[in-house]
Structures are given as structure tokens and as C-alpha cells.
Amino acid sequence: ITLGHLNIITRAASIFDRLIVCVGYNQKKSPMFTAQERVKMIRKATSHLPNVEVEASDELLAHYARRKGACVVVKGLRAVSDFESEFTMSLINKKLNPELDTMFLTAEEKYMYLSSSAVKELAQYDVDLSEFLPAPVIDEFRARLNARR
């Protein structure tokens, strides 16, 4: 979880009474942490937000939302390219679950460049990660990176 993710979560939590952060499994990516490890880190980073729950699911998002009784999915957007792919996914989700709407929150300017890939690359050069990652995540991130070397 980056500070950009945390910013979107914090803003969404101020809009909704209950916010579920769903950590999905993406076979196209090779994440540094397992889904359960990411859930644990996100829970630490969002512990100050009482209306936020964090879970992992291997279901399609539209099916997961239906099972949880959710009617809105919140997606963060950094650039036009994010919008194109997320808009397509929102149409697919709507087809699979007609009750589901998608809300797009644009990244704050200071997080527009921020991605997990960029943070991984910067971390290899011993850059101070406090501008990119929540404090509870930095130590675990560095430890995992060092273990991979």
C-alpha cells in the first residue's frame, strides 16, 4: 500500500459509512507480498479509520461486491490511462452485477506519479520511503526487499 492508496482510502472512508478494502489476486502481477500479508499491512495503515475493513478475495470484484452487499466500488485514478482500463472494468462489473456502480476518485497531485513499481525501484537505491509508503509498511517492505537480494 502506498500513500496514494491510503489517500484514496481515507477520502472514500469520509464519504461512506462503511468501506471495505478488497485485496484481490491479479495473475498478471507478481506481488512482493501475499494477499494476506497485504491485508495485514493495510489494516495497520488504516487503523485510524474506524469504518474501514480490509479483506482478501479471489472472486471477481462484481461477485464479491454482491456477496458483501456493496453497491459502489471506489477506484483511484492517476492518469488518463488508468481511466481507460478502469472504465472498461466498470462496464464489465456493471454487466456482471447491474446493482454495482463505480466511483472514480482522482489522485491528489502529489500522488499522481506514485506506483508500487516505482516504489520498488526506488527502494533498491536506499531512498527514504516515508514520502511514498505509510510508516507501518516501510519496515516490512525493506525487510522483504533485503530478503530477496
Locate each region found by the language model.
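Nucleotidyltransferase catalytic core that binds NTPs
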Residues: 1-149
